[in-house]
């Protein structure tokens, strides 16, 4: 068990105890990257998004990922049905707030999904600011520079702590320069990663997929979140040290998903701490 300074004691989640089946309801842009990321860490993805299939798959899956990057009336209905069924069967669920910063409809959907007590709700700084009812200058699906300024980050951490206290069954994660975790009454931060991870699409989606995979493998929500975020960011750090160009960097980051776990000491490189009560 690794006792990180200022962070909860967590165990190395790799190798997985079994190959959890993760149902992913996601967008067409990053669906392949997410499926492969789950496979690279020895999970099993199923990209089932049709309501008439849910009853069968809910009997099989170990975790559910709801990514708001795909959006239409049919998708909204499917996300709500899947969320409700997963809650009834106590299947751990991750909700990814893709596009919430720029869309009132997605924000309304996210608030409805919160009512079904997902294990994790995640988004970038701008998405999480909107979800916490803070002003944001985010556009589209990307976080804005203003939302990543020190004062704005501190404001977000405080708002997330308030939200987590109101919804103690859910962990809230904001990804950015510092990844912020709010759970129950505590706020933590993680500091691994490189700027290049913001330069190819799907990095946040992959983190959501990794969190869901670890939850499906029976890991508690703090272990799953800290491990998934830090593991992916450390994969990026390794990739940057050996590649030139963003295409090669992307490929090597994905390669490292299956390789970094071979280093039994990888968790020694996790950087972060606890912010405490703000």
Where are these regions (language model features)?
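Conserved N-terminal subdomain of the carbohydrate kinase-like
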Residues: 2-95
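Acidic-glycine-rich active-site phosphate/pyrophosphate-binding loop
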Residues: 3-15, 171-192, 264
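General beta-strand structural signal in soluble alpha/beta enzymes
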Residues: 24, 46-48, 93-97, 121-125, ...
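Glycine/small-residue-rich loop that forms an oxyanion/phosphate-binding "nest" at active or ligand-binding sites
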Residues: 75-123
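Conserved phosphate/ATP/ADP-binding segment of small-molecule kinases
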Residues: 105-187
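Short pre-catalytic strand/loop immediately N-terminal to key active-site residues, enriched for Gly-Thr
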Residues: 190-201
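Conserved post-catalytic alpha-helical subdomain immediately downstream of the catalytic base
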Residues: 201, 209-252
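Charged C-terminal helix
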Residues: 233-278
């Amino acid at each position: 068990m690794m006792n990180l300074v200022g962070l909860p004691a967590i165990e190395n989640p790799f190798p997985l105890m079994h190959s959890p089946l993760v149902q992913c309801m996601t967008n067409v842009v990053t669906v392949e990257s997410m499926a492969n990321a789950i496979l690279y860490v020895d999970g099993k993805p199923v990209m089932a998004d049709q309501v008439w299939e849910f009853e069968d798959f809910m009997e099989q899956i170990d975790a559910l990922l709801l990514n708001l990057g795909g959006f239409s009336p049919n998708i909204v209905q499917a996300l709500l049905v899947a969320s409700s069924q997963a809650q009834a069967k106590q299947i751990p669920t991750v909700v990814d707030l893709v596009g919430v910063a720029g869309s009132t409809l997605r924000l309304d959907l996210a608030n409805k999904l919160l009512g079904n007590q997902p294990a994790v709700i995640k988004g970038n700084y701008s998405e999480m600011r909107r979800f916490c009812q803070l002003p944001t200058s985010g556009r589209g699906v990307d976080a804005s520079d203003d939302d990543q300024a020190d004062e704005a980050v501190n404001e977000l951490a405080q708002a997330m702590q308030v939200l987590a206290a109101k919804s103690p069954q859910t962990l809230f994660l904001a990804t950015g320069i510092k990844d912020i975790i709010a759970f129950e009454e505590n706020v933590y931060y993680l500091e691994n990663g490189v700027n290049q991870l913001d330069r190819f699409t799907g990095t946040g989606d992959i983190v959501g997929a990794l969190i869901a995979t670890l939850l499906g493998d029976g890991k508690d929500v703090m272990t799953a979140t800290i491990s998934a975020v830090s593991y992916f960011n450390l994969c990026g750090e390794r990739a940057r040290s050996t590649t030139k160009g963003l295409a090669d960097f992307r490929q090597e980051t994905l390669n490292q998903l299956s390789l970094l776990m071979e280093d039994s000491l990888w968790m020694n490189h996790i950087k972060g701490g606890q912010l405490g009560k703000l």
